[in-house]
Amino acid sequence: MKASMFLALAGLALLFVVCYASESEEKEFPIELLSKIFAVDVFKGEERGCKGFGDSCTPGKNECCPNYACSSKHKWCKVYLGK
């Protein structure tokens, strides 16, 4: 009983240390994850001439960034699946 309580407290202490040490890395994790999923930097839309995910577009015009296509149904840029 004492050993299991000690292991539980040691585990919680270790979890606290790991969370505290990785706190600064966790703040950038969602941005890195989205950048890798969509293969473009979706957070710098003002710097580029193309439109990113969810931006309104006109079907037929090549306004969307690479890896995106303008949806004729919804009229916004979405991920191009190659169909």
UniProtKB/Swiss-Prot annotation:
Residues 22-48 form a propeptide. One of its GO terms (molecular function) is ion channel inhibitor activity. It comes from the Eukaryota. It comes from Cyriopagopus hainanus. Monomer. Negative results: has no activity on Nav1.4, Nav1.5, Nav1.8 and Nav1.9 sodium and calcium currents. The modification Leucine amide is found at residue 81. Selective antagonist of neuronal tetrodotoxin (TTX)-sensitive voltage-gated sodium channels (IC(50)=1270 nM on Nav1.1/SCN1A, 270 nM on Nav1.2/SCN2A, 491 nM on Nav1.3/SCN3A and 232 nM on Nav1.7/SCN9A). This toxin suppress Nav1.7 current amplitude without significantly altering the activation, inactivation, and repriming kinetics. Short extreme depolarizations partially activate the toxin-bound channel, indicating voltage-dependent inhibition of this toxin. This toxin increases the deactivation of the Nav1.7 current after extreme depolarizations. Expressed by the venom gland. Disulfide bonds join 50-65, 57-70, 64-77. Belongs to the neurotoxin 10 (Hwtx-1) family. 15 (Hntx-3) subfamily. Residues 1-21 form the signal peptide. It is found in: Secreted. The keyword Protein biosynthesis does not apply. Keywords: Amidation, Disulfide bond, Ion channel impairing toxin, Knottin, Neurotoxin, Presynaptic neurotoxin, Secreted, Signal, Toxin, Voltage-gated sodium channel impairing toxin. GO terms for cellular component: extracellular region; host cell presynaptic membrane. This is Hainantoxin-III 9. InterPro entries: Huwentoxin-1, Huwentoxin_CS1. The presence of a 'disulfide through disulfide knot' structurally defines this protein as a knottin.
